[in-house]
Amino acid sequence: MTYKLKISYDGSFFRGYAKQKDENLITVQSELEKYLSLFFNTKISTFGSGRTDKYVHAIDQTVSFKCDSDYDPKSIQNFLNSKLTNIYVNSIEKVPNSFHARFSIKSKTYMYVINTGEFDVFKQRYEYQYNKSIDIKKCEDIINLFIGTKDFLSFSTSKLENTTRTIRWIRIIKKNKKIYIFINGEGFLRNMVRMIVGIILTYCENKITYQEVLDLFKNPKKGSAVIKVPGCGLYLYRTIY
């Protein structure tokens, strides 16, 4: 029996999504598996649509797991929500055994939130406190450089050999003093979204030229984009299957 979970979590309280070698570190995956194993009275291993780093949030993370037991999904959901802290299970359903949260996914959308107004002490764990104006039109000048299937080695600290990824679209929305950057793609490398946003902001500040951004793709070098915005403003916004 395969179950599919849709969850949200506040990344401020976790050392990322994935389990760590140090079992004392609390992660989203370790907490989920602890209480799923308690419910089913057997060890449960889960698979997420992707890993989020520490302080990164999720509005729509998808998780799957297999188990021999057949339970009403609602009873599992109610149990988990009664035990979990800073994680909420939005839904659980039974799915075909071929479903896998990581390998069945078609695309993911990330959202990055920036506060361009005055520093907000109550939102500092949920928005990047940039605290200065952003020229949206200038930001949009370089968006097309990221769209398509490209080698994003310069925008990642990943150890993977294959660093080619596909970005489908990027949208920037301004609401009052907040800037929301949405990035949709088929897959992402570690720190890729945060480094893309970092370069967009650096370009807006006139600290890097259009040609220099272009060169990050023409001559890719691991992590050469350098600028990485804080994890607190990043949300896994939507997972599509």
Swiss-Prot record:
Keyword flag Isomerase: yes
Keyword terms, alphabetized: Isomerase, tRNA processing
Catalysed reactions listed for this entry: uridine(38/39/40) in tRNA = pseudouridine(38/39/40) in tRNA
CDD domains: PseudoU_synth_EcTruA
Residues annotated as binding substrate: 110
One MF annotation (Gene Ontology) recorded for this entry: tRNA pseudouridine(38-40) synthase activity
EC number: 5.4.99.12
Residues at the catalytic site: 53
Top-level lineage group: Bacteria
BP terms from Gene Ontology: tRNA pseudouridine synthesis
UniProt keyword Isomerase, yes or no: yes
Annotated InterPro entries: PsdUridine_synth_cat_dom_sf, PsdUridine_synth_TruA, PsdUridine_synth_TruA_a/b_dom, PsdUridine_synth_TruA_C, TruA/RsuA/RluB/E/F_N
Pfam families membership: PseudoU_synth_1
Uppermost EC category: isomerase
Homology family: Belongs to the tRNA pseudouridine synthase TruA family.
Function according to Swiss-Prot or TrEMBL: Formation of pseudouridine at positions 38, 39 and 40 in the anticodon stem and loop of transfer RNAs.
Complexes and interactors: Homodimer.
Name listed for the protein in its UniProt record: tRNA pseudouridine synthase A
